[in-house]
């Protein structure tokens, strides 16, 4: 992902304020609620029958935290996202058979959640920088599929 110095500063500056536990759980939860067909990959998570069940599900929250910790790794390696996510791409492609479009959807949901949490601080410029990052991460995660 090519970011200008200002974009990198915006992304890393805001990310330093992110509560990974909270934002991760909310982002994954929203993905499962807004795009319910994604729930099929999470059969072991128990009750996902209603939005309140999804958003309060401890397994959703725990996996959301794991996803965001992995996203943090990507932010530290923006120049090598394919390498950073090679093993995860292989896992999601070969073993889990996740539709790579879901990575793009989750990235967009993450941007929405960040906007909700940071309000006016999440300026259009910050959003544009984050869109570049989530797009790059989604592309890297989908790499094994090609």
Curated annotation (Swiss-Prot):
Keywords: Acetylation, Heme, Iron, Metal-binding, Oxygen transport, Phosphoprotein, S-nitrosylation, Transport. SUPFAM superfamilies: Globin-like. Disulfide bonds: none annotated. The modification S-nitrosocysteine is found at residue 93. Pfam families: Globin. Residues 2-146 form the Globin domain. The modification Phosphoserine is found at residue 44. GO terms for biological process: hydrogen peroxide catabolic process. GO terms for molecular function: haptoglobin binding; heme binding; hemoglobin alpha binding; metal ion binding; organic acid binding; oxygen binding; oxygen carrier activity; peroxidase activity. The modification N-acetylvaline is found at residue 1. GO terms for cellular component: blood microparticle; haptoglobin-hemoglobin complex; hemoglobin complex. Coiled coil: none annotated. Red blood cells. The modification N6-acetyllysine is found at residues 59, 82, 144. The modification Phosphothreonine is found at residue 12. InterPro entries: Globin (IPR000971), Globin-like_sf (IPR009050), Globin/Proto (IPR012292), Hemoglobin_b (IPR002337), Hemoglobin_oxygen_transport (IPR050056). The keyword Acetylation applies. Belongs to the globin family. Involved in oxygen transport from the lung to the various peripheral tissues. Heterotetramer of two alpha chains and two beta chains. This is Hemoglobin subunit beta. It comes from Taphozous georgianus (Sharp-nosed tomb bat). The gene is HBB.
């Amino acid at each position: 992902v090519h970011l200008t110095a200002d974009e990198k500063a915006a992304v890393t500056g805001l990310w330093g304020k992110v509560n990974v536990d909270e934002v991760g759980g909310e982002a994954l939860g929203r993905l499962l609620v807004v795009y319910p067909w994604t729930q099929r990959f999470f059969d072991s998570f128990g009750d996902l029958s209603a939005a309140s069940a999804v958003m309060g599900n401890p397994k959703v929250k725990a996996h959301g935290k794991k996803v965001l910790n992995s996203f943090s790794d990507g932010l530290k390696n923006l120049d090598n996202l394919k390498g950073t996510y090679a093993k995860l791409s292989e896992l999601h492609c070969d073993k889990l058979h996740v539709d790579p479009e879901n990575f793009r959807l989750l990235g967009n949901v993450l941007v929405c959640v960040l906007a909700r949490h940071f309000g006016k601080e999440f300026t259009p410029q910050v959003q544009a920088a984050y869109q570049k990052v989530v797009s790059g991460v989604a592309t890297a995660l989908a790499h094994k599929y090609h």
